[in-house]
Amino acid sequence: MVLGGCPVSYLLLCGQAALLLGNLLLLHCVSRSHSFNATAELDLTPSGAAHLEGPAASSWEYSDPNSPVILCSYLPDEFVDCDAPVDHVGNATASQELGYGCLKFGGQAYSDVQHTAVQCRALEGIECASPRTFLRENKPCIKYTGHYFITTLLYSFFLGCFGVDRFCLGHTGTAVGKLLTLGGLGIWWFVDLILLITGGLMPSDGSNWCTVY
């Protein structure tokens, strides 16, 4: 069949070629657009936060309270690493000069335990607004040195006459006296049992009982 001097099959072939060329051009444009968007996303930083280059590449300068990036000091405990409380060993002057730290450790009731600030830092790979190192307040002045209440109570009950419980807790002087008197003929042994149960006999280094989970 001939239409206007041109075979219909020839016209259809030209149309298919034009469609194929159009599809190729469209695919090329889409590919270039996708590549540009991917590059732009790498350069973007959250609104209100300027990205820092160098070692602190996962930090931003905090400038906008509406930014999705929070200050590092607002991170939950599981995303930060904190130092142990500073022990000033009763030196009040050193505590005042530094501005934080513990004068004493330990305590049974909450009101007996001192609280202080400690140095914390955001974990590697956590993105937050700088500074990445900060002070976190209200940390209890307690430490653990491997003393377990149940173990010490068993020592006191079965071997208390020989002062094993006090040796274990670091009270060496009174432990020797308890050993030489065989637990004060049983009186000292009984008194130490009561003191352990009521919290009157604790480790000599001011540490708390380790918790058994």
UniProtKB/Swiss-Prot annotation:
Location relative to the cell: Membrane
Residues in the signal sequence: 1-22
Domain of life, source organism: Eukaryota
Main location: membrane
Ranges where the TM2 domain occurs: 146-194
Ranges per topology, Cytoplasmic: 165-181
Keyword field: Glycoprotein, Membrane, Signal, Transmembrane, Transmembrane helix
Extracellular side: 23-143, 203-213
Transmembrane annotation, as ranges: 144-164, 182-202
Pfam family, one: TM2
Gene Ontology CC annotations of this record: membrane
Keyword Heme annotated: no
Membrane-topology annotation of the record: Multi-pass membrane protein
Record: glycosylation sites: 37, 91
Family membership noted in the UniProt record: Belongs to the TM2 family.
Protein name: TM2 domain-containing protein 2
